[in-house]
């Protein structure tokens, strides 16, 4: 099974890359879904603070790769020859995926703080940071989980600063090449 991982800072374009993968017929497993489920089970409101607290507790209790280990059966359950995993947050998760899936490729998505903040203001998800300070705090939390080190391990990098159309074309071409699909 070929597994393509996506890593990037909040609002860098991971969700858009996942949407494009789905459009190409590549199943997508979102690591954050495991966190969202646990927040809901705990009866907590779906806020960035609650998602961060639950994710931090899982990592503290079960290890820094806990969410990757929870996600592996979901990836395998797709039964597809190629799947994409969205939302890698740390180098321990990358190591776990590389160990478990010999054919694993990591795509890093880069986007500036200013661009990411503008996107957050426009997309309106419940876990989105609303102020620059909240985004900086979220960035620091995720960097503390090893997100920067995970980005450094990317097999390929895509910069997402231009138009949505340009980013989509670059991601589509990359996913087609990696997934053995025609563009």
UniProtKB/Swiss-Prot annotation:
Pfam families: AAA_17
Domain of life: Archaea
SUPFAM superfamilies (alphabetical): P-loop containing nucleoside triphosphate hydrolases
Binding-site list for ATP: 8-15
InterPro entries: NTP_hydrolase-rel (IPR022970), P-loop_NTPase (IPR027417)
Keyword entries, A-Z: ATP-binding, Nucleotide-binding
Family (UniProt): Belongs to the UPF0200 family.
Protein name in UniProt: UPF0200 protein Memar_1556
Gene Ontology molecular function, alphabetical: ATP binding
Gene3D superfamilies: P-loop containing nucleotide triphosphate hydrolases
């Amino acid at each position: 099974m070929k597994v393509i991982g996506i890593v990037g800072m909040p609002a860098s374009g991971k969700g858009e890359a996942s949407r494009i993968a789905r459009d190409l017929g590549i199943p997508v497993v979102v690591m954050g879904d495991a966190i969202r489920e646990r927040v809901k089970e705990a009866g907590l409101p779906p806020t960035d603070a609650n998602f961060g607290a639950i994710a931090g507790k899982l990592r503290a209790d079960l290890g820094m790769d806990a969410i990757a280990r929870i996600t592996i059966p979901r990836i395998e359950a797709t039964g597809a020859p190629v799947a994409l995993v969205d939302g890698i947050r740390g180098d321990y998760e990358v190591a776990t995926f590389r160990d478990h899936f010999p054919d694993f490729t990591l795509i890093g998505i880069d986007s500036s703080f200013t661009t990411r903040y503008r996107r957050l203001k426009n997309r309106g998800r419940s876990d989105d940071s609303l102020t620059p300070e909240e985004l900086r705090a979220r960035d620091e939390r995720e960097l503390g989980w090893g997100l920067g080190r995970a980005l450094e391990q990317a097999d390929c990098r895509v910069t997402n600063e231009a138009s949505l159309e340009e980013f989509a074309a670059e991601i589509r071409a990359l996913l087609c090449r990696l997934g053995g699909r025609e563009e």
